[in-house]
Amino acid sequence: MYIEEIILDGFKSYPTKTVIGPFHPQFNAITGLNGSGKSNVLDAICFVMGINNLNLIRVNRLDELIYKQGQAGITKGSVTIKFNNEEKPSPLQEPYRDMKNITITRQIVLGGRNRYLLNSHNAKPKDISDFFQSLKLNINNPHFLIMQGKITKVINMKPIELLGLIEESSGTKLYEVKRTNAIKLMVKKDQKLGEINKVLFEEIEPTLVKLKKEKEEYNKFVSNNEEIEKYEKVEIAYKYYVAKKMMTKCEEKIEDAKSEEKILEKGIKEIDKDIEKYKIEKEKIVKETNTASEPMKILISQKEELEKKISQLKSEAKMENKEKAKEKRRREDIKKEINNLQNKLDDYQKNNEKNNKNLKSYEDLKKKIEILKEELNEKQLTMNCLLSAGTNNNEYTGSFREQLKNYKTNLSKAETQINNFLQNNKHLEKEIMTLKEQRKKYEKEYNEISKEKDIEEKKKKLCEQELDKLNKEYNNFMELDTLKTDKNILYNDMEKLQQELQVLKNIINSVKIDYKIPSNMKSTDVLGQIYKLIKIKKEYINTALAVHLILGGKLTYLLVQNKEHSKRLFEYNNFSSGSKRVTLLPLEDCVISREVHEKHIEECRRNVGLNIKDKNDVIYFLDIMEYDKNLERIIQYLFNGTLICSNVDLCKKITYNPNKKLSYTTITLEGDKFDTSGSMSGGSNKNINLFLLNYEKYKHKKEQYHDNENKLKEVSEKLKSLEKAEEKKKIISKELQIYENNLNNIENRMETSKYGSVNKKIEEHKNEIDKGRNELSELYKEQKKLTEVIRKLEKDISEYEANKDKKEEDLKETIKKLKNKIKQLETEEHKKKEEIDDVLLQIENYKKQKEKETNDLSSTDEIINEIEKKIEDIEKNINITKENLKELENKITELQSSFSSYENEMKHVVKKIEDLEKKKSENILDLKKLENTLLDLQKDLKTSSDTVKYLYKTHVWIESYEPLFNKKYTPYDFENFRHDVIQKKIQALQNEQNKLSININRKAVQMYEQVQVDYKDLVTKKSQVEEDKKKIQEVIADLDVKKSESLLAMYQQINEYFQAIFSTLLNNAQAKLSIVDGDLANGIEMKIAFNNNWKESLTELSGGQRSLLALSLILALLKVRTVPMYILDEIDAALDLNHTQNIGDMIRTQFPHSQFIIVSLKEGMFSHADVLFKMRFIDGISTVNRHALDIRQNTNKKEVQEVKRRRVTIHDKEPDHD
């Protein structure tokens, strides 16, 4: 099998389809100059074979293989190799063996995507790789590819390295691998033996001793456990006996406590009767006091009216301040609008150049039209003169000659005026020279004044800069008035909030409990008052009345963790002696008589015909409250299973439900309550204090107050900074005024000084001269115009007299043209005028709007001044009213002193009521203590009962042994039972157990037996490993023998090929491979002889001879592992020219079934090739010329084929460099 054709398309330097071939089955050569593209053919072969290392084909990425990397419009590159497989037997495997031709294509598309085709069908890269590797053509380990560097490498190889080449060819590497693996396995066996010995002597034997000891300890541990269990049983039996005895005692004490509770309740009722009697007496005193306090009521009424008036005036002031702020905002808006209009006017001013151009163009048109009209008037005048020789509308009347006379008179007048102006100007110039001389005398004095002016101007400029800086920094102080207004509004709001807060605070303080936490308690032990811990959700605010009626006085309860904390807090704060009633609620006392959950509520809703998710008609108290999730039990306790309903009917249906499980106490949103006992309450609830709402309102107002306080602080700071800056501005403005006045005075001095007077006269003369020059310029223009008119008239008279008819026709034609031209220009002038008028109209509109806004600004300022005046009047009125209020309060104080007798009686009655209340509180406290005692007893009863039940349930043996409890002569005799002695015995045993348990091994018995088994197993394994080691040593010895035999046989075969190849390449010379020191393990070396005269060293040879020797060895190695194709890249570079001519014969004789593709630069090499491809580079394109030589008859071949020389020229683009 051999390469028949290579087709390149868009690959490297081959932009179009290029067919290289046909190739000869044996010797093919490629030649060409450097840069001609010859190496690209070898790169193409490597590319198709699937080379991985792109550096070997001189690119970094696949895109670079496309012609000019795709920049010339070619985005795809492909290489196709056509193999001829007609020779039999084929080296290929199935299914390729019977195919005559095989085509492999590889394509690369810009972007790096590539694909393979095998016989025009898509193929995987692995299929292609397997195809070539089946032919021993592995491009990524290419033995068939010989580069120039490989020859140099072989020349410099040492004997051991040369031996390595033979080993590689012989396949003894496999022996080496097996031998190495066997040695590694033997080392592992040695290690295993060492490990087994180590385990036996260092682990197993010591472990056996250790486990024996652990086994004894474990038996002791089990015995101790049995003893402990016996003592614990006695102790449990004692606990059970004591708990059962405690149950009986608690039941007796509870009966006694209940009797005492009834006595205390009776005493409290009697105290309530006495309190009621004193309250009636107190009301009587109040009535008498009210009768005597009518004047006081009048004064109080007047006081309230004054306070109301002050409040009203403050509201008015606040409204006026708001109005003032509104007007100030309006003023700022007007200012912004004025600035906006000014900006627009400024924009028109910036576009003034364009407007001026339009205006100039318009003026030029006007002038042009006027000139043309004058010319038309002239022509018409002339025409009139020609037609009628009468008068016309011009200032000059009469015939042509009369007009000529008038023009000449006017010309004479103009010339006279010119002479007068010239003489006057000359006189004035002389006068100016005289005045300048006179001015020099006063220059010194003037310069001193001028210096003063410069100094003042500098000072003025500095002041202006400072003012500009301040105005920019503080935005022209526009915020000042706004901030003042904001401050007043905030102050008034805070005053109002403070009054509202005080009212709310008084309400809260009426129930607030002030307390201190003892040092032996934590802050978390006191949770706080109920009203602070819960909150009604905003969406359920309509339930507020119902919630307050349910909770009532419980809102003021102080919640603590337990009874002990309650007791400490009560005693520490001395609540019993205080005037305010304080109720402490320990968490453990919150006994819920009936717990209500969501499922119960849903059942109620279903029962009354509502949707189970309807939360508006039947309301679950947990849904409407905000609280800490840890306090859910408290909420259950507070509401005590009461539900809130939207109407009375729903309440009745739920409360009076025959099914008691679905019957609950209910209350309507209006406050009508229905109890399960059958009672109902309701009525007017107008005076109910909705305390939770007030507390939330208080918190909200307090937050508002703090927010306003922070805002006020911020506004005050800003205002202070602005006022400070404004003060600075006033000072600078005064300084600026002074500097401006100084400058005006200096300018007046400069004007009134002698220098200034003379200078003024000089300027007046200069102005007069300039004026005269302007008039003179007009006179010169008039003179020129009159001269031209006179000349023209004289010419017209002459022409008219010569040709009157023709003159008339010409004048008519000229007049017609002038009229048309004037009409055209007037149309253009009209358009220009409209454009200018639009711009001027827009400017005028903006100016009018600005003027209107300016007037509005003045009006707004006046309104603000009026409002400020009103605010001032209101504040004066407030101050006067406050003074009146103070006088009134003094009168009330004087009047109050006259009520001392009533007060004494009242104090006596109040004292009695307070004493009774105190006594009642003490009784209530005793009752509460008794209740707590009852709760403790009930708790103890429950604890004892629970203990009995728990012990009975968890220790089933109690049922059998209970009759023996506290019986003599049994293990459960409690007469001499001492808990501490039992505990000590148990403790002693547990201590011993703890010591044993540290190192106890509960599996010691099983482990001891297992370790004995392991010991026997390891001894058996040790014997097995020793036997395996012996077998491995025998295998290694056998491998060494086989390797030596195989290597020697390969050496002899390669030596034979080496001698034959070298003799073919170099006539009259012999070569051989010699074993170093008679031992193949020492390596081999190459020997050479000329005419049977063997050289001792290769150093005597030329470089070409040494290269030929290395080439022969490489080819001999290749022949051992024959492949269908060999590629040699410039291997003749190191060869002499006369050594290359026999390479063709060598290929034919030594490699009759292999194809050679050789890249060469030497004629001696390629001139003997069967087919020669010559590469050239013409006009940026590579060309390929094929030369097929006559095949001469070889000694090893009989086939003779006549091949005509043919030349195929393929134009290509610029190639890669070789």
From Swiss-Prot:
Pfam families listed in its UniProt record: SMC_hinge, SMC_N
Coiled-coil stretches: 209-517, 693-949, 978-1045
SMC hinge domain segment(s): 525-654
Keyword presence, Cell division: yes
Main location per the UniProt record: nucleus
Gene Ontology terms describing biological process: cell division; mitotic chromosome condensation; mitotic sister chromatid segregation
Highest taxon of source: Eukaryota
Gene Ontology MF term list: ATP binding; ATP hydrolysis activity; chromatin binding
Biotechnology: Possible candidate for an effective malaria vaccine as determined by epitope response in sera.
Cellular localisation: Nucleus
Residues the record lists as binding ATP: 32-39
Keywords: ATP-binding, Cell cycle, Cell division, Coiled coil, DNA condensation, Merozoite, Mitosis, Nucleotide-binding, Nucleus
SMART domains (UniProt xref): SMC_hinge (SM00968)
Listed SUPFAM superfamilies: P-loop containing nucleoside triphosphate hydrolases, Smc hinge domain, Tropomyosin
Disulfide bonds: none
Chain's role: May play a role in the conversion of interphase chromatin into condensed chromosomes.
Comment block on domains: The SMC hinge domain, which separates the large intramolecular coiled coil regions, allows the heterodimerization with smc4 forming a V-shaped heterodimer.
Protein's UniProt name: Structural maintenance of chromosomes protein 2
